[in-house]
Amino acid sequence: MKLLKEQLMKISKALVFDIKRFAIHDGSGLRTTVFFKGCPLRCLWCQNPEGLNTQRQVIYFKNKCIHCRCCQQFKEQINYQNDRPYFQNHQDFDQVIKTCPSSAIQYDSQEYTLDKLMNKIKEDEVFFQHGGGVTFSGGEPFMQGEFLIKILKRCQKEKIHTAIETSFYTSLELIKKALPYLDLVYIDLKIFDEQKHQVCTNVSSQLIKENIRYVLQSEYKDKVIIRTPLIPTMSATDENIHQIVKFLIQINPEVKYEMLNYNPLASAKYELVNLKYGLESYQMFTKQQMQHFYDVALQAGIKNLIKE
C-alpha cells in the first residue's frame, strides 16, 4: 500500500519539544536527551505536559511578557483575558510569534528532519567517546516510531550509544523494530493494578505488562531497566511495589529495577501550556522514606535494585 504524502512527511520529520545537553540521569555518562512530542498517556503527575499533544502548540512565558499588548491585534488567534493571552491552537501563529518583542509567545516544539536532528546530536559527540550517548525521551518516543527507528539506525551507524525512556504503551511490532538499535531501555511500569492505572494515566497497564513480558524473555533482556516513579498515594504504596516486583521476577529473576523519587518541580510547566496541576501539595520523599520502599522491593524478591 502506498503511503500518502502527509504520512511520508510524518516519517521523514519529527516534532521535538526539547533537546537537553549534558544530561546525567538518562543513561551512562554525559548524554544528549531528545524529547519527542506526543504521548498516549495522561499521567496525573506528568513531568512534561508540553510533550503530551501530538501537534505543535503555542506556549506563553508569563515572566517574559512586557504587557505591550502587541498580540491583541490578532483577534482570531488570541483571546486576551485576565491580563494574559489564550490561544486558539488550530490557527497559524507564525506572525504572532514574530510580532512579540520579548519572545513571550513561542511554539512548544520544532520540526526536525533526520539530517538536522543527527547533526544536532553529533554536536556533542566528543562526550559520546567517553561513555556518553543519546537518550530518546518524551512524551513517548514510540508515538513517532518510524522516525525513531530511522534515527536509531543512524546513531548505531555512527557508533553512538543509544537509550530510550518509554512507557512501552505501543505496538509490539514497533518495539521489535527498535530493540536491535538500542543499547539501554528504560521502561516505566507505574501502577500494576489495571483499573488504578487507568484512573491515574487514562490507559490500562495491560498492554504495557504484555510488552514487558516479551522483552524480559527476549535476547534483549539485559538491556532493560524497569522503573517506577513514586507518586504519593498513587504508585508509592507498599502493595503496588510488591505487585510490580513479583510480576517482574516471575518473568526474569535477574531483572533490573529502579524507583524514582517524586519530583514536585513540574508544576511551573503547566502554566506554560494553560493546564492545571493538581499535585502541588505533594513533596519529595525523604531518604528514610525511600529506604522503606527499597526494603519493600527487596523483601518482595528483587535482586538487582538500582538506588538513587
Predicted regions, residues:
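Auxiliary Fe-S-binding modules of radical SAM enzymes
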Residues: 2-28, 221, 230-308
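Class I S-adenosyl-L-methionine
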Residues: 101, 122, 213, 294-298
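Iron-sulfur cluster-binding cysteine motifs and their immediate structural context
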Residues: 44-51, 70-86, 94-110
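Flexible, acidic/Gly-rich N-terminal and inter-domain linker regions that tether
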Residues: 1-72, 80-81
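Conserved dinucleotide-binding and phosphotransfer motif residues
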Residues: 103, 157-158, 300
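Conserved AdoMet/S-adenosylmethionine-binding subsite of the radical SAM
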Residues: 115-272
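Short cysteine/histidine-rich metal-coordination sites, predominantly Zn2+-binding motifs
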Residues: 59-65, 83-89, 111-122
